């Protein structure tokens, strides 16, 4: 007897409300907006089918395998409160659908062709549950939070950084000079901007050399370990690794990668190199808003953050809550705990759809960067806590007296906030007063307070629950 050819509804095969999820399943929560006339069960089943074993018609080769073993299943659908014709579809994928240790392969299935599917008006991946059985196939961050603190010998406070500006156009020597001034003033790190790679005005090798000189000079003067995120992102993986090798030969502590524009395969390769060679890895998320900013289509940043923790990175930019870039407080804190903690409970108030157990994968330091200055320091210290990197680009280099005084102002403000917190003061309520008190003892901080006293970026956050 021949097989039964023809087209049948996805929901007959892929919508299984009685399915009990397994501990080894990868679980996904999709925000589905079906086309008019398409029932939610059919839309959810279509997502499960098209992101796993299904295609638009029955094919005779289905008989050569066990679809029951390999198919994705839509096991639950709930409507989204306050939205018409929008649903959260929960899909379970058997572990065997995915190559071990490959974020690239996981995403090619789960967020591949299905996002262009005609029966859906829009589709957004809100969250993923990565089971320990799959997590253990990844190396994860090259070093993690504790190893980084031990390497740098810095404890009990957030780390301070600064992106060198103007981001494009400086010569390598002037760039190195700016790095030196910031590190000498009291910052822990300076940073290449994400789009600084190897342009005609400043080739990568020259920049690496002058930055290394700046690091060593600042370390000698301050007695503290310093670093500069040398951006190894390049047009090919081979060139990227070549740059990381040169950084290692210079003896610097950290390199950097733009993981979304560079791609997950390149990122994982670099993370492996960094662990093998004792380099920390700073991750910039350039391009994330293309993927995550629309509420009804794309992929939420918490998924990109989880993917980065698997692929590997020791720092990642995670919004500021208070600065110039997008980030609502509870949602930002949601992916901050997903980056740092070993075990994260489901918490829908923070947008966390699944309990996530990271087993032995190290944590990632969230980086707050973008439009922040000394008046934000109390809020940042309270929101992000000690295990974070606070990055002030304009908030350092924009100081009226120059880079080193700008760095001094930030370091004094941070030390004042940490001390006040440790003494039991309420940073949220007394923040401005704490900064004012500290500025009496630091002319640099007083000047910074004066310049930025009125600056605010007040817009509604797009990324709401």
From Swiss-Prot:
- N6-carboxylysine: residues bearing it: 191
Q: Extract the InterPro entries matched here.
A: RuBisCO, RuBisCo_large_chain_AS, RuBisCO_lsu_C, RuBisCO_lsu_C_sf, RuBisCO_lsu_fd_N, RuBisCO_lsu_N_sf, RuBisCO_lsuI
The residues that hold substrate are: 113, 163, 167, 285, 317, 369
Q: Which cofactor does it need?
A: Mg(2+)
EC numbers on record: 4.1.1.39
- Summarize the PTM comment: The disulfide bond which can form in the large chain dimeric partners within the hexadecamer appears to be associated with oxidative stress and protein turnover.
* Catalytic residues (positions): 165 (proton acceptor), 284 (proton acceptor)
Q: Which GO terms describe its cellular component?
A: chloroplast
Keyword Chloroplast attached? yes
Oligomeric and partner information: Heterohexadecamer of 8 large chains and 8 small chains; disulfide-linked. The disulfide link is formed within the large subunit homodimers.
Other noteworthy facts: The basic functional RuBisCO is composed of a large chain homodimer in a 'head-to-tail' conformation. In form I RuBisCO this homodimer is arranged in a barrel-like tetramer with the small subunits forming a tetrameric 'cap' on each end of the 'barrel'.
Could you identify this protein by its name?
Answer: Ribulose bisphosphate carboxylase large chain
Tell me which species this is from. Answer: Senega cruciata (Cross-leaved milkwort)
